[in-house]
Regions:
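Membrane-proximal helix-turn-helix segments that form the acceptor-binding/catalytic region
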Residues: 137-156
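Conserved donor-binding/catalytic core segment of Leloir-type glycosyltransferases
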Residues: 157, 191-210, 216-221, 230
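Carbohydrate-associated surface elements
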Residues: 162, 184
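Nucleotide-activated donor-binding/catalytic signature segment of Leloir-type glycosyltransferases, i.e.
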Residues: 242-264
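Short alpha-helical donor nucleotide-sugar binding micro-motif in glycosyltransferases
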Residues: 263-264, 271-276
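Short hydrophobic beta-strand element within catalytic cores of glycosyltransferases
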Residues: 301-304, 308
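Conserved acidic donor-binding segment of nucleotide-sugar-dependent glycosyltransferases
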Residues: 316-332, 341-346
Length: 388
């Protein structure tokens, strides 16, 4: 379970934007995050989010002290568990602590006792049991562990309104303790594309949850069309799935048109987006979908599965236009049909591109994310309490 360096200027809000949040001096929040958060070979939306808010929170009154927690979260070995326990134990009483849920939610025996003396908030990028391909017993155990952690802390932060609703209903949390801080987006130059239609792009780690096999099946059904596709994302999370995907690509005879490039970052990733005509995302589960807003920030339309928080990420242009198409999950035929429509109907392309440019202008920046997080941290109770 589980991107690359982002080029941007950290948020510098005015006092008026920040009314009621900025104190006379910076307060400290201790941010406990996965040990691989800076690893360019293992990019993820969660890692990118964590890194970005570390740089933007000071603009909203919070100095961030980072604590990397090495380990195979949410299934840590003894050394990782001991390391996390030591990190939390060494923090002073009443310290404000933001915990990445990938680290925190699987180890209630470590986190819950610390909620008695620390002011804890847990940032949930993806509910642990929602990872695709888990054994039912493993998913149930992770679910139970996560529930114990989230019920013990005074604040839970999710990355979409959909995720807030899911956490409240699934774990029986008090709605006033679950907050949204959706990822922001950096507006980038409009993508020139390739020819306006044929270059497809999927930016996602190659894992069962991202469902690239469904993309392969859909592309095989429209092999008569002149498309090329790049799947950009880490290949090290699930080598077995990557091998299966390569076999599938070869079986369909698509190897010369569909490439698994591995992760890209910086100028290479920017160039990849600049050449794209359509973003395609075939996930089984997403709490938001940062790759979608990264595409829309460049005016690239989106074709994605209608799951989780993806509809929020796609959103609408100010005039109500949809900058993307949402298809039912588990339906490669519907995906193929929409691809055929994209290629065959110029009016569809024009409409989607116009809406994508409108949505681009309306996207919230990362300052909105940092402001939301700062507000949650500011409101953490002075004395930790047990939360039901």
């Amino acid at each position: 379970m589980q991107r690359a360096r982002l080029a941007y200027v950290p948020a510098q809000p005015t006092a008026a934007e920040n009314a009621g949040i900025i104190p006379m001096s910076l307060r400290t929040v201790h941010f406990v995050m996965p040990g691989g958060v800076d690893d360019p070979a293992a990019p993820s939306g969660g890692n990118a989010y964590d890194r970005r808010v570390c740089l933007d929170l000071p603009g909203f009154g919070w100095q961030v002290t980072r604590h990397a927690a090495p380990g195979t979260w949410p299934h840590p070995d003894r050394a990782a568990r001991d390391g996390l326990a030591r990190t939390l134990r060494d923090l002073p009483d009443d310290a404000v602590v933001l915990l990445d849920g990938l680290v925190a939610c699987g180890v209630p025996e470590i986190v819950v006792p610390e909620a008695e003396r620390l002011r804890l908030a847990v940032l949930v990028h993806l509910p642990l049991g929602d990872e695709t391909g888990l054994d039912a017993a493993v998913a149930a155990d992770l679910d139970t562990r996560e529930r114990a952690v989230l019920r013990a802390v005074p604040a839970v932060i999710a990355t979409s309104d959909w995720a807030v609703r899911r956490l409240v209903s699934h774990h029986g949390l008090a709605p006033d303790r679950v907050h949204v801080a959706a990822p922001g987006a950096d507006i980038a130059p409009l993508a020139a594309g390739t020819d306006g239609v044929s270059r497809l792009l999927c930016v996602a780690a190659v894992t069962p949850r991202k469902g690239q096999h469904r993309l392969v099946e859909a592309l095989a059904a429209v092999r008569d069309l002149p498309w090329t596709c790049e799947c950009v994302g880490g290949l090290g999370h699930d080598p077995g799935y990557v091998a299966h995907l390569r076999t599938l690509i070869d079986q369909y005879g698509l190897a010369d048109r569909l490439r698994l490039t591995g992760p890209r970052s910086g100028a290479d990733l920017d160039a990849t987006y600049a050449a794209a005509d359509l973003m395609v995302l075939t996930s089984y589960a997403e709490t938001y979908g940062m790759a979608v807003t990264e595409a829309l920030a460049r005016g690239i339309p989106v074709l994605a599965t209608d799951v989780g928080g993806l509809p929020e990420a796609v959103g609408r242009a100010p005039d109500g236009g949809m900058p993307g198409i949402l298809v039912p999950p588990e339906d490669p035929a519907a995906l193929a049909a929409e691809l055929r429509g994209w290629f065959g109907e110029p009016d569809v392309r024009r409409r989607l591109k116009a809406a994508a440019r409108g949505r681009r202008a309306a996207l919230d920046g990362w300052a909105t994310t940092a402001r939301s997080l700062a507000g949650v941290l500011q409101r953490l109770p002075e004395a930790p309490r047990s939360a039901a």
